[in-house]
């Protein structure tokens, strides 16, 4: 956690990341995504390099994105990374048929949406998506997400 390491241990993690990106020449030739669940970290990257795409991480499901929340997100981030349950909530056994409006709400405010939590080892994927990771990816892409973050890059690259 960059904020903790900076305040408690005196380590400049943000500076180290910036320096590493610069020395690898990734800060000018590639699209760089900076992801954090800490808005102060994203704010510092915005100040140092406004071309970095800042992604606010939500590690727990969200079911709604009201305007005041979205307005606050826009102060710090260009995109969000939300877990699958934020788009397709689950019961104890299956994913519900009702999707949330989170992707539409974020897109209406020009915030990109990435979804994470894809793994071929989860029970709900097997039951709801016929044990087929491609069907799972297709289902979330059909919901309008801008990208997926997966534990199985080989599966995702074969899908592409």
Model feature map: region roles:
Residues 20-24, 45, 106:
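Hydrophobic, Leu/Ile/Phe/Ala-enriched alpha-helical segments that form helix-helix packing faces
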Residues 39-43, 156-157:
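Short, well-ordered alpha-helical microsegments
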Residues 1-31:
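Active-site cleft segment of glycoside hydrolase catalytic domains centered on the general acid/base Glu
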Residues 28-33, 144-147:
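Short active-site oxyanion
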Residues 4-11, 47-160:
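C-terminal active-site rim and adjoining tail of enzyme catalytic domains
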